[in-house]
Amino acid sequence: MSLHQFLLEPITCHAWNRDRTQIALSPNNHEVHIYKKNGSQWTKAHELKEHNGHITGIDWAPKSDRIVTCGADRNAYVWSQKDGIWKPTLVILRINRAATFVKWSPLENKFAVGSGARLISVCYFESENDWWVSKHIKKPIRSTVLSLDWHPNNVLLAAGSCDFKCRVFSAYIKEVDEKPASTPWGSKMPFGQLMSEFGGSGTGGWVHGVSFSASGNRLAWVSHDSTVSVADASKSVQVSTLRTEFLPLLSVSFVSENSVVAAGHDCCPMLFNYDDRGCLTFVSKLDVPKQSIQRNMSAMERFRNMDKRATTEDRNTALETLHQNSITQVSIYEVDKQDCRKFCTTGIDGAMTIWDFKTLESSIQGLRIM
């Protein structure tokens, strides 16, 4: 595991370029900083300044090498690099509340933006007018959209929101998409069609993170009531929900067709397994804490603790986990959702950690990525 402390401020969100030599992140303000890897060091290469509100989402398209950002100023920008300089293009989102999340589609010909306006803007490039325009998915969303993920077919879109529900919509746009083939989620896919809806029957919480599996047949989401859920469209949309004993999880990603990594307020990534029988189980925490050493205190330390912390005990305030505060985002670092070898986490502590499954499997007894 490699940990890099980028900032003292929280990292709101991040995105990697195609070959993982650069990372774009927001230091909890209206800027995007792009860091470049030089040996074992990360050096700041660019600062993207166009937003005038907090940046809430970043995504970097691997093939076209374009960055999309969205923010609390209700705007989104598509950034393209020309002669080593990143130039922004404004996107017409048509929203009256903050944008909360942004994600490129797999073919990179459109992207989706969630917002506090209780809608999703699906944006595509209109070449005759030379600008990015959007279509809105509104019904039946009743609250802020917190998270989005695209199905591999480039048409279906999963959305988690503050009305305690996780939904799958069709984001088919005839101007840029070919007619989609039938999927286990459904066959008729006009724009805005609600394909599936989960949660919200008296229980649940805000849906913080959603993730399709590599096949697109499974959908995982994490909610503020400390639950992890997986829906399997190939098993007539059977839902398995696991109520965990942990603090709420904020981000989730499939790392194989049967394995899910999630992380959040416990400052530690966790591995869950979903087997072919439809059973969802907790496997292990992936951050193995070092054993704390008991030691005797001097009288001087005892009095200092009484003065500073109103206690006579030697309480170390550092957490045993690598991250010292909540993890806000999990992303795939090496390979893909089908066969992830390494994944990355960033958090409120301003740190970025890269986790290697091979190293984890050797240090955690019985750990295997299925």
Swiss-Prot record:
Gene3D superfamilies (alphabetical): YVTN repeat-like/Quinoprotein amine dehydrogenase
Keyword Glycoprotein part of the UniProt annotation: no
InterPro entries: ARPC1, WD40/YVTN_repeat-like_dom_sf, WD40_repeat_dom_sf, WD40_rpt
Molecular function in Gene Ontology: actin binding
Major location category of this protein: cytoplasm
Record's keyword terms, sorted: Actin-binding, Cytoplasm, Cytoskeleton, Nucleus, Repeat, WD repeat
WD repeat feature ranges: 6-45, 50-89, 140-179, 202-241, 244-284, 322-365
Pfam families: WD40
SUPFAM superfamilies, A to Z: WD40 repeat-like
GO biological process, one term: Arp2/3 complex-mediated actin nucleation
Compartments, as annotated in UniProt: Cytoplasm, Cytoskeleton; Nucleus
CC per GO annotation: Arp2/3 protein complex; cytoplasm; glutamatergic synapse; muscle cell projection membrane; nucleus; site of double-strand break; synapse
Membrane-spanning residues: none
Function: Probably functions as a component of the Arp2/3 complex which is involved in regulation of actin polymerization and together with an activating nucleation-promoting factor (NPF) mediates the formation of branched actin networks. In addition to its role in the cytoplasmic cytoskeleton, the Arp2/3 complex also promotes actin polymerization in the nucleus, thereby regulating gene transcription and repair of damaged DNA.
Assembly notes: Probable component of the Arp2/3 complex in which it may replace ARPC1B.
Similarity remark: Belongs to the WD repeat ARPC1 family.
Protein name: Actin-related protein 2/3 complex subunit 1A
Source species of the chain: Mus musculus
Gene name of the record: Arpc1a
